[in-house]
Structure formats: C-alpha cells, structure tokens
Amino acid sequence: MLVRRIIVRLPSSPRVWTQYNPRIFYSTGPNTNSTLVDTWKQKLGAYWEKSQNKANETANKLREYSVNFKTQWDKAQKSLKDANERLSQMENDSNDSKLNYNAEGKIKDLPSERERHRKKWARKMELYLDSLQETIFTATRALNDVTGYSSIQKLRNTISSLEEELKDTKKLVNEAKEKYETAIKARSGSQKEVNELLQRKNSWSPTDLDRFTQLYRDDALNSQTEEQSKVKLAELEAKEEELSTNLYRAILTRYHEEQIWSDKIRRTSTWGTFILMGVNILFFVIFQLLLEPWKRRRLVGSFEDKVKMALDDHQKEQNLAISEMSNTIDNLMDKKLQETQTKPHQEEVPKILTFSNIVADFKIWCSLQWTIYYNKLVTLLPETTVTFTKSCFYSYSTLLLSLGILLGHCI
C-alpha cells in the first residue's frame, strides 16, 4: 500500500512535524490532555475554595451561636437561682413576726396578705418570667437573626428615620418658600417705588434723592437675597424629591422582603408540618406493627397465667377439702375402733332392717352401679382424659363422701 508523506515546515517556533495520511492523521504537537486537566483543576480548585470558605463561615457561625447559647444558658441558670432566692426570702418575710402587724385583723387587703393567698406555683412562675425576661428577649433576637427578620426591622427603622427626615425637609422647604416669596415681594416693592421716583425725577427733593440711593442699594441686596433663597429652595426641593424617592423605594423593599420572609416562614412551617406528620405516621406504624402485638401477647400471657393460677388455687382448695374429708373419715374410723376396743364385753345388738334402710341401701347400690358403668364407658372411649364440670365434680365428691360415711357406720 502506497502512503504519501508530506512534510510541512511551519514558520513559527516550535517546529511541528506532521505526517499526512489519507486515512489516518498523526500529530506530534503538544498533548492537549494536560491542558484539559489543568483547566479542570482550576475549575475544581475554584469550587473547592468557595465550598471551603462557605464551610468555614458556617463553622464560625455555629461556633458563635454555641458560645451565645452557652452564655444565655448560664444567664438563665443564674436568673432562676436568683428567683429561687427571692422566693425563699419572700417566704421568710411572710413568716417573720415583726412584719406581720395587722392590728387584730382590722386592716384588710394588705399586699402581703394577698401575696400569701396566691398559689406558690403562680408566684414562682411570675418570678421566673421576670428573671428570664432578658434571656427571652435575647432568644427572640437570635431567632430574628436566624430567620432574617432583624434586617427587616432595620429597614423599618430606616423607613421611620426617612419619614422623620422628609417631614423636617418639608418644613424647611415651606420656610424657604416663604423666604423666597418675601424676597420677591421686597424686591418688587422696591422696584415699584423706584419706578415711581423715576416718573417724577424732575421734581426730586434731597429726601427723594437719598431715598432713591437707598432703594438702589436695597434692590441689589434684595436681588442677592432672592437668588440665594431660590438656590436654597431648589436644593431643598431636590433633597425632598430624593428623600421621597428613597422612602418609596424603601417601603417597596420592605414589603418585598416581608413577603419573602413570610413565604419562607410559611414554607418552613409547611415542611415542619410534613415532618411532624411523618413522625406521627412512623410512630403509628411502629405502635401497630411492633408494640401492639407485643402488648397483645403480653396481655394474653398474663391472662393465661392468671387463669392457671386460679385453676391451681381451685385445685389446691379441692385437694385440701378432700384431704380434710379423708382426715375426718379416718378420725371417725379411729374413734370407732377405739370404742370397739374399749368395750369388748358388750354384746353386739343385731341390726334391725327397716324399709328406710333398704331404700338407702338400694340407692347406694344404684349409685355404685352407675359409677361402675360410667368408668367402664370412659375406658371404652378413644380419649384417655376425662373432663368434669363443676357440678359433676361436686356430685362425684358428695357421692364418695356419703359412701365413705356409710361404710364407716357399717364397720
């Protein structure tokens, strides 16, 4: 493959040799990557410097706020301590006998008496508020500084000063107008008198000549005074116009800044409301998914424990009653045996069967037969456990007790 080589010799230094290829272009000039890297380094360095400056400013502000907060916290603690001391001093004064002279209660509604009738927490709250007034004012001012309302307050003070200055300038303008009008009237009067004297120039007397000379001098002074009054009036009117313009601009700026501040506060309150709603929803989810099941399990467990304890107590009571019944039966049987052992010489009297005895024995036989059938039926059932109701348990216990007593009497 044939490749054409063209050597281009540039007049400027340094010399660059390029190789031309119809398909590929190779350049042996300076590398542009280093230039791009340097450019990006400069841009990033500028951004990094700006961000570092902002971070330093933020850190300084936070440090200043922390120092102010610590100072105000110390002041608040000192104020509360002073309030407690004053409260204790007031209580000591109220208990002092030297300060409680009341002429046998004839003097009513003394300040100390009213103060004693007030509640302690009300007096403490009043003293705390009085002591923390400076701290509250400082906290309010710090809040205004953070939200930017302090600048708006300064702007409002500037507007008030501009209004006062404009009011004073208007007074000066009115005075300058009066002086200017007075100067115009004085000059026009002197010119009118000069014209009258000039009309009868041929018949002047020495007095008229002196008067003309004086009027001529006064005319020059009046002209100068009029010119000065005019210049001063123009300056005051220009100042009034400037103050009016500045006042108008300041009022517009104030309304604009207050609108921005109110929008910022409204936006902050909206975000605060959303955050509170999110926190409430989070707490609701936590309570419903975590705490409520745990609480339910705990309640069920405690209820089961209480039921088990109640059943155990009932079982203990039943066992105690059965043991007492068995002890009573054993004691009766022991007494019966002792009686039979102590009286062996007595002859046994044959028992006479009566109809009532036969009926009682038949009932006992029926109950025993029913018990045997029931136990046999229970053994035939697939379940091995037997469940008694309270009434069935009581009837079964009564049957056993009566059977034991009957056997004891028979023996």
Curated annotation (Swiss-Prot):
A Gene Ontology biological process noted in the UniProt record is: inner mitochondrial membrane organization
Stretches assigned to the Mitochondrial intermembrane side: 292-411
Residue ranges that the Swiss-Prot or TrEMBL entry lists as coiled coil: 69-103, 148-250
Q: Where in the cell is it found?
A: Mitochondrion inner membrane
The record gives the membrane topology as: Single-pass membrane protein
Q: Which UniProt keywords apply?
A: Coiled coil, Membrane, Mitochondrion, Mitochondrion inner membrane, Transit peptide, Transmembrane, Transmembrane helix
Which Pfam families does the entry link to?
She9_MDM33
Q: Give a yes or no for keyword Membrane in this entry.
A: yes
Per the record, the similarity remark reads: Belongs to the SHE9 family.
Name this protein carries in UniProt = Sensitive to high expression protein 9 homolog, mitochondrial
Q: Which organism is it from?
A: Kluyveromyces lactis (strain ATCC 8585 / CBS 2359 / DSM 70799 / NBRC 1267 / NRRL Y-1140 / WM37)
- Phylogenetic placement of the source organism: Eukaryota, Fungi, Dikarya, Ascomycota, Saccharomycotina
This protein's gene is called: SHE9
